[in-house]
Swiss-Prot record:
Its EC number is 3.4.19.12. Cleavage is inhibited by ubiquitin in a dosage-dependent manner. Cleavage is blocked by ubiquitin aldehyde. Residues 90-100 have a biased composition (Basic and acidic residues). One of its GO terms (biological process) is muscle organ development. The different N-terminus extensions of isoform 1 and isoform 4 determine their respective subcellular localization and differential effect on myoblast fusion and accumulation of muscle-specific proteins. The different N-terminus extensions of isoform 1 and isoform 4 are not essential for their catalytic activity. It comes from Homo sapiens. It is an enzyme of class 3 (hydrolase). Residues 71-107, 237-264 are annotated as: Disordered. It catalyses: Thiol-dependent hydrolysis of ester, thioester, amide, peptide and isopeptide bonds formed by the C-terminal Gly of ubiquitin (a 76-residue protein attached to proteins as an intracellular targeting signal). It comes from the Eukaryota. One of its GO terms (molecular function) is cysteine-type endopeptidase activity. PANTHER family: UBIQUITIN CARBOXYL-TERMINAL HYDROLASE (PTHR21646), UBIQUITIN CARBOXYL-TERMINAL HYDROLASE 2 (PTHR21646:SF17). Residues 267-599 form the USP domain. This is Ubiquitin carboxyl-terminal hydrolase 2.
């Protein structure tokens, strides 16, 4: 996968995404972290960045007020807890252990490259026909003209350009741009439906000034002329290579005997250009049973806000995408371009075709969905009250109640749990507790000198007692001074869907590296009761999805292993390719995000 530039500077300007509704702090004290802290400010420091001029033409034609501020200093009163960087105080490390990770770094690359726009940046901007040396009318005469154009470029449907030569040959780079343009024209001429869809979205024929080009991919697609079939606002691309346009579908070997019920949810997702991180997470969420039903049964409609300032586009496009996946045949490939448009409006860091981190994408996506279906329309004023006199269990319940007064959605019902952090003074024995909501847990990978560790080893390392001494000494409110303390984490409230992030990304002053340690995790009956802060019998989980990252920190690829909520069978989702797999193949050293669902009591007998 090619290395691309960072998010365009213009989409990280805080003024363009600032909403007064998001600029008010509400629930408790908020300590910024890498996920929710001053995103634009850290990106725009001139000493860190070397931005080149951005074209005046833009996909977003005017400043938007959609979604939260890109500064993300406040998340409508709820902290966006990024588990990879601790907050200002030692108590802020409520969901992670390990070193800080700089913004923009991830397993999918980015840490080894400067921010900015490279010379050959493939941006999400319309391509001007004049700049590309072709015009719409010249290239729509006939398919024979297009064939000659491809021939003059010494290319074919399967031609590949070595990206290593692009920097050495400006003419070759220009040829690649022309190839992308001609590709869109070829599709237009060969598929009348494509032209109709294009004209409906971008203007009638004769008034269009841009070439109907696809969003530039990171490489020349294998299918120059795929079968095109529109469904609603989404596009289904048949997977047959070299097919003639038409309504027929290519058959996949071994699937002819599958009935429609067993085949549901097995559509692939088209890679739009370094979007494997997005496709991997979307397939994992598509196989989350209750979230899938929430979209398929259109239950989200009753939670949408219909005011003049309401933002609902992200959840609507997400639901439509899930509906398309589950109503398509296994031979279909769904293009998530409409969804990508909305997620990059909500989180401008995903504008363009950069390599991104799957966990960061999951955090932004869940937060955006939660905000749009939050049942709380009018948040109460924050009235801090002292709960230290209450027993820990009662204090945890009160803190959870206060959280739900401000943040209450179906998304939160599924993914949000509560973490308990305790500090015990070694001098006087006083113990103070803090309760924080969490969306996932970032687990350090235990290093024991062996090539293999277990998931329970990682959980024990996450919850083990740490001694805070020296410069790390906190202030004891009883001793009224900085004292040596013992810190410990435990889980106060277990979520229905538990997402475990394996911290394979290791930072050092010299370089960034990826840990390839094999983590042995159970597929069934993950018993986490030993990590509960109070006695509970409802803390056993079953695995249903894994987001995998293969490769290095300089470049890699994301895939997903998912168990169908209907059939219980496992499949590999590799962008547009979906293949069956055995449950014995799920455990690999590429596992990055583990999705567990809370087991029902009968399954634990």
């Amino acid at each position: 996968m090619s290395q691309l530039s960072s998010t365009l500077k213009r989409y990280t300007e805080s003024a363009r995404y600032t909403d007064a509704h998001y600029a008010k702090s509400g629930y408790g004290a908020y300590t910024p972290s890498s996920y929710g802290a001053n995103l634009a400010a850290s990106l725009l420091e001139k000493e860190k960045l070397g931005f080149k001029p951005v074209p005046t033409s833009s996909f977003l034609t005017r400043p938007r007020t959609y979604g939260p501020s890109s500064l993300l200093d406040y998340d409508r009163g709820r902290p966006l807890l990024r588990p990879d960087i601790t907050g200002g105080g030692k108590r802020a490390e409520s969901q992670t252990r390990g070193t800080e990770r700089p913004l923009g770094s991830g397993l999918s690359g980015g840490s080894g490259f400067p921010y900015g726009v490279t010379n050959n940046c493939l941006s999400y901007l319309p391509i001007n026909a004049y700049d590309q040396g072709v015009t719409l009318t010249q290239k729509l005469d006939s398919q024979s003209d297009l064939a000659r154009d491809f021939s003059s470029l010494r290319t074919s449907d399967s031609y590949r350009i070595d990206p290593r030569n692009l920097g050495r040959s400006p003419m070759l780079a220009r040829t690649r741009k022309e190839l992308c343009t001609l590709q869109g024209l070829y599709q237009t001429a060969s598929c009348p439906e494509y032209l109709v869809d294009y004209l409906e979205n971008y203007g009638r024929k004769g008034s269009a000034s841009q070439v109907p080009s696809q969003a530039p991919p990171s490489r020349v697609p294998e299918i120059i002329s795929p079968t095109y079939r529109p469904i609603g606002r989404y596009t289904l691309w048949e997977t047959g290579k070299g097919q003639a346009p038409g309504p027929s579908r290519s058959s996949s070997p071994g699937r002819d005997g599958m009935n429609s019920k067993s085949a549901q949810g097995l559509a692939g997702l088209r890679n739009l250009g370094n979007t494997c991180f997005m496709n991997s997470i979307l397939q994992c969420l598509s196989n989350t049973r209750e979230l899938r039903d929430y979209c398929l049964q259109r239950l989200y409609m009753r939670d949408l806000h219909h005011g003049s300032n309401a933002h609902t586009a992200l959840v609507e496009e997400f639901a439509k995408l899930i509906q398309t996946i589950w109503t398509s045949s296994p031979n279909d490939v769904v293009s998530p371009s409409e969804f990508k448009t909305q997620i990059q409006r909500y989180a401008p860091r995903f504008v363009g075709y950069n390599q991104q981190d799957a966990q960061e994408f999951l955090r932004f996506l869940l937060d955006g969905l939660h905000n749009e279906v939050n049942r709380v329309t009018l948040r109460p004023k924050s009235n801090p009250e002292n709960l230290d006199h209450l027993p820990d269990d009662e204090k945890g319940r009160q803190m959870w109640r206060k959280y739900l007064e401000r943040e209450d959605s179906r998304i939160g019902d599924l993914f949000v749990g509560q973490l308990k952090s305790s500090l015990t003074c070694t001098d006087c024995g006083y113990c103070s507790t803090v309760f924080d909501p969490f969306w996932d847990l970032s687990l350090p990978i235990a290093k024991r000198g062996y090539p293999e560790v277990t998931l329970m080893d990682c959980m024990r390392l996450f919850t083990k007692e740490d001694v805070l001494d020296g410069d790390e000494k906190p202030t004891c409110c009883r001793c009224r001074g900085r004292k040596r303390c013992i810190k410990k984490f435990s889980i106060q409230r277990f979520p229905k869907i538990l997402v475990l992030h394996l911290k394979r990304f290791s930072e050092s002053r010299i370089r960034t590296s990826k840990l390839t340690t094999f983590v042995n995790f159970p597929l069934r009956d993950l018993d986490l009761r030993e990590f509960a802060s109070e006695n509970t019998n409802h803390a056993v989980y079953n695995l249903y999805a894994v987001s995998n990252h293969s490769g290095t920190t300089m470049g890699g690829h994301y895939t997903a292993y998912c168990r169908s909520p209907g059939t219980g069978e496992w499949h590999t989702f590799n962008d547009s390719s979906v293949t069956p797999m055995s449950s014995s193949q799920v455990r690999t050293s590429d596992a990055y995000l583990l999705f567990y669902e809370l087991a029902s009591p009968p399954s634990r007998m």
